[in-house]
Amino acid sequence: MDRRESSVMKSPSLRLPAPAKLNLTLRITGRRPDGYHDLQTVFQFVDVCDWLEFRADASGEIRLQTSLAGVPAERNLIVRAARLLKEYAGVAAGADIVLEKNLPMGGGLGGGSSNAATTLVALNRLWDLGLDRQTLMNLGLRLGADVPIFVFGEGAWAEGVGERLQVLELPEPWYVIVVPPCHVSTAEIFNAPDLTRDNDPITIADFLAGSHQNHCLDAVVRRYPVVGEAMCVLGRYSRDVRLTGTGACVYSVHGSEEEAKAACDDLSRDWVAIVASGRNLSPLYEALNER
């Protein structure tokens, strides 16, 4: 029995979180010939998560159990991540994966990308591959522009398509996240003819001084007015209200858990609202006791 097969038998399972992220700013500074956009953004994790359970075996097959309907395995980022890692490393092992889905889809919280990143990190361990984090980030970029930040695992300033990352230590406030009753297509927003794509870049110092714009906001609200309505409602509870990614989720920033919970309790009569705590270290690596 080779080393990888032995490790699979000794450490057969892991249950790990796949956390949400918030974009604390999102600037579009250009469009590339390949159609991708040059961005500047700041990522921070929150303690609201999907959960995935992985059990390694020698079957060679990747099997996923999920309550999500209508997503073929070939398109599911969890399955694609597992198969990509398996092909890259040339391993014969397989895995059973169970997804407990808590994060909304199409919400700008990065749930699918986070699921893919947790899959890469978990199976790298269970299959005893020993790949470093940068290698996993490079693999993740082949799955989607947001996957690398979840593998990176620390709050960061990001440029390029979001893959050039610099650790950024930030306050860890409390947030109230509102989930409007709509699904925003990222591709639709980035292809919108009215999206401004040539905004001036800023510096980290500009962001820290209060430059928190999201350049997707106007295009999103024009197409999904309920997102603008959610922002107006949140504005009753905080002066700092923002859109994460291309939405649909919006969030407000609060100085204490008590303040955030009071706002959430009030909002929950009419909206789906979640209290979350900011995290500079991903809950994934907190669970693994890594930094």
UniProtKB/Swiss-Prot annotation:
Annotated residues for binding of ATP: P104, M105, G106, G107, G108, L109, G110, G111, G112, S113, S114
EC number: 2.7.1.148
Single GO molecular function: 4-(cytidine 5'-diphospho)-2-C-methyl-D-erythritol kinase activity
Record's keyword annotation contains Transferase: yes
Reaction catalysed by this enzyme: 4-CDP-2-C-methyl-D-erythritol + ATP = 4-CDP-2-C-methyl-D-erythritol 2-phosphate + ADP + H(+)
Pathway: Isoprenoid biosynthesis; isopentenyl diphosphate biosynthesis via DXP pathway; isopentenyl diphosphate from 1-deoxy-D-xylulose 5-phosphate: step 3/6
Keywords noted in UniProt: ATP-binding, Isoprene biosynthesis, Kinase, Nucleotide-binding, Transferase
InterPro entries per record: GHMP_kinase_C_sf (IPR036554), GHMP_kinase_N_dom (IPR006204), IspE (IPR004424), Ribosomal_Su5_D2-typ_SF (IPR020568), Ribsml_uS5_D2-typ_fold_subgr (IPR014721)
GO biological process, one term: terpenoid biosynthetic process
Record bears the keyword Cytoplasm: no
Family, as annotated: Belongs to the GHMP kinase family. IspE subfamily.
HAMAP family, alphabetized: IspE
Function: Catalyzes the phosphorylation of the position 2 hydroxy group of 4-diphosphocytidyl-2C-methyl-D-erythritol.
Listed name of the protein: 4-diphosphocytidyl-2-C-methyl-D-erythritol kinase
